[in-house]
């Protein structure tokens, strides 16, 4: 309740007070000037700086896990260093914006931590895009195993969904609240490399960099100053300090921690997930030596893969052996997928969807594309993890079927490996 009262005073009452003061000053009568003096005295008694400190602390957060007093334990769980407790979102009560900014700051650290694990733990190499980028232009990057271009047998390509996730992640929320295994792509990478796959990890959400807008010099006139009435301009120029003080006061308490205004500078040929996937296909995957390419694509990553197929249908059909989708949001009608493409998907793709049904149970679909089976969970973000074993079994069946010239079939409950065995 106290917080609501403070916000009401700052956002509603004070602007009205300043407006009334301005109107009173324009009238100019002695008694009105006395009212102005009284109002100023009233405002001077309100310790607004202290009020705002209580409302919201500075949006300044540590840039390391240690700074947050968190670390990953031997089970890959994020825990408080002193207490061993899981991450707490509502660190400060009644300060949702501050808590959200704190969570986002931690999320950025998690992203960097996963990048480090991809390079150090999985021994992947970071490759910058575009391949011919100059030193002055923005760049993205992907991760590749050392044999990505030379492995003659098979390659696994991973595509995550949309949002804040980056290369190596399925769901940031899972990494923070549950563990690295369920939320990251690391289990897929390690198992694939152990089984002789080359690996490429796409980074489809790294589409631009943000640069701060250049600030207008303080002495530069505003664009519409020439249209300002002469009387108003003279009054403003007579008392510039008071005008600036009033403007700064209002701006500060209307938006006490105004975030920096930024411009988005898009990365050449990688300005969207679809562009990114097409670029990586043209410059890496299609040129790789692997005879069999296999994809795992989660959520929007499934839509991204279907768009890649639409753009490079013949090439994809020639090189891709199987595609595992996890709760994909693709739509073959909206994306104008051809009949031949839909037929290929029915034979070579399987979509593990969120469902209350047991793992690998067939789920009805209204779209004429690929088989749908249950991922064994109703949580969208968990579908890639819960279907982990089933997907590799599906890949094994697909590769064996290709070698024996028979059609691959999705895993069924009767022959699945239990997830709990992982």
UniProtKB/Swiss-Prot annotation:
One Pfam family, short name: Arb2
GO CC field: cytoplasm; nucleus
Gene Ontology biological process terms, A to Z: mRNA processing; RNA splicing
Keywords recorded for this protein, A-Z: Cytoplasm, mRNA processing, mRNA splicing, Nucleus, Signal
Signal peptide: 1-19
Active site per UniProt: 299 (nucleophile)
Residue segments, region Disordered: 213-253, 403-422
Places the protein is found: Nucleus; Cytoplasm
Amino acid composition bias (Basic and acidic residues), ranges on this chain: 229-242
Keyword Ion transport: no
Family: Belongs to the ARB2A family.
Role this protein plays: May play role in the regulation of alternative splicing. May have hydrolase activity.
Protein name: Cotranscriptional regulator ARB2A homolog
Gene name of the record: arb2a
């Amino acid at each position: 309740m106290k917080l609501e009262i403070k916000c009401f005073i700052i956002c509603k009452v004070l602007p009205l007070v300043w407006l009334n003061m301005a109107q009173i000053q324009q009238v100019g009568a002695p008694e009105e000037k006395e009212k102005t003096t009284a109002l100023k005295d009233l405002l001077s008694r309100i310790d607004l700086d202290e009020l705002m400190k209580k409302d919201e602390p500075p949006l300044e957060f540590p840039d390391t896990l240690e700074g947050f007093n968190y670390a990953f334990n031997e089970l890959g769980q994020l825990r408080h260093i002193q207490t061993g407790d899981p991450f707490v979102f509502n660190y400060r009560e009644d300060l949702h914006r501050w808590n959200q900014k704190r969570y986002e700051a931690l999320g950025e650290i998690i992203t960097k931590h996963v990048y480090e694990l991809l390079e150090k733990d999985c021994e992947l190499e970071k490759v910058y895009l575009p391949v011919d980028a100059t030193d002055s232009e923005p760049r993205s990057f992907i991760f590749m195993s050392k044999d990505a271009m030379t492995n003659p047998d098979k390659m696994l390509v991973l595509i995550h969904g949309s949002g804040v996730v980056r290369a190596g992640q399925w769901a940031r929320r899972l990494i923070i609240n549950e563990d690295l295994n369920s939320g990251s792509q690391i289990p897929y990478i390690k198992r694939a490399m152990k089984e002789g796959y080359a690996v490429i990890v796409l980074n489809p959400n790294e589409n631009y960099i943000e640069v701060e807008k250049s600030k207008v010099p303080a002495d530069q006139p505003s664009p519409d100053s020439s249209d300002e009435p002469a009387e108003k301009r003279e009054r403003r120029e007579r008392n510039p300090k008071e005008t600036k003080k009033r403007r700064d006061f209002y701006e500060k308490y209307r938006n006490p921690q105004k975030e920096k205004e930024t411009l988005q500078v898009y990365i050449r040929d990688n300005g969207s997930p679809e562009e990114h996937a097409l670029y990586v296909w043209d410059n890496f995957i299609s040129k790789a030596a692997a005879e069999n390419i296999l994809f795992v694509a989660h959520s929007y990553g499934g839509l991204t893969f279907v768009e890649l197929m639409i753009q490079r249908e013949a090439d994809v059909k020639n090189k891709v052996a199987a595609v595992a989708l996890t709760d994909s949001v693709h739509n073959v009608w909206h994306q104008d997928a051809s009949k031949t493409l839909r037929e290929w998907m029915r034979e070579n793709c399987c979509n593990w969807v969120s469902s209350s049904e047991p793992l690998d149970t067939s789920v009805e679909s209204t779209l004429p594309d690929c088989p749908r089976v249950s991922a064994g969970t109703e949580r969208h973000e968990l579908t890639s993890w819960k279907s982990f074993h089933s997907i590799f079994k599906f890949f094994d069946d697909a590769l064996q079927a290709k070698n024996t010239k028979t059609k691959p079939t999705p895993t069924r409950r009767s022959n699945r490996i239990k997830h709990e065995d992982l």
